Amino acid sequence: MRKQMGAVGILLWGMAAGRAHAHGVVGQRSFIEPFITEDVNPKNEFVIARPEWDHARDGRTLSFGFGLEKKISDRFSLTLDSSWLDITPKPAAEPHASGFDNLGVTLKYAFFIDPVHEAIASIALESTAPTGTEKVGAEQNASFKPFLLYGKGLNELPDALEYLRPLGVQGDAGFEIAIDRARTTALAHNVAIEYSIPYLQQAVHDFGLAWPLSNFIGDTEFNFEHGVNGEEQGRSKVFVTPGFVYMDRWVELGVAGRFPLNQAANDELDWGVIFIVDLFIDDILPWTRWQPIGGMRPPTPPAGVTGS
């Protein structure tokens, strides 16, 4: 064995290629939990921390996001998430504010899974309850967002482009609709482009890369928001979020930058940094594999392995 995995990983990479990854699996592909884009895969996970530091011309915002997703059946999941925010405005004379954001509840169903073509599609409905602190910007009216999610690996590229096969795409698109008609309805679309070193090693060519590089996945996300009506009607914001994650069978750790790509986005953000700590709880706590529909489930097979 090349190197001990340390406290984060007890798994033995050399024992079986692909054994390290068993979450978000479609065929030989393991999709990550993106930074901004919604994960297309229903799964059991606990995002214990999603810290984000945003710097803008009108102040600085520090947020700590968290969320729990639980599978109800093999293709259906329920997510609860929120965040704590600390806002330091400019000028300093303006009041400092901190508190919790609203509670989000998301139902997700994967209606299409094609392991051979590494393709998956889901539908989801996210609703937001007005439970947060108004002084940090938490809306005091409920809202909801129906959206479509998709994921696709580039495993079908010809041999001449085999080193592009580790590329994969995840995305989501949907309308953020407020119950309060005075608020803006927005069309949001996020795209995550991933390059998987584990996939390169296992499905294309084994370069013998050592841990932890062998578990790295590059991720660049493009985040779009377009106002459909209200104060933001006709106004589009575009951001880019480049970063990378480390992912093994138990945890995903990642860091990314966040930058505006047009003037409307720059009015909201100069730059930001976002982190993620995501625990795959069904391998850490096997009893969490129990599902209301289907009962206790076996461990998710590693990428590239057919399981029940």
Regions found by a protein language model. Give the residues of each.
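Bacterial N-terminal signal peptides that target proteins for export
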Residues: M1-A7
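Terminal low-complexity, poorly structured segments
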Residues: A7-V8, F76
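Cleavable N-terminal signal peptides
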Residues: V8-G9, A20
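Transmembrane beta-barrel domains of Gram-negative outer membranes and organellar outer membranes
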Residues: A22-S308
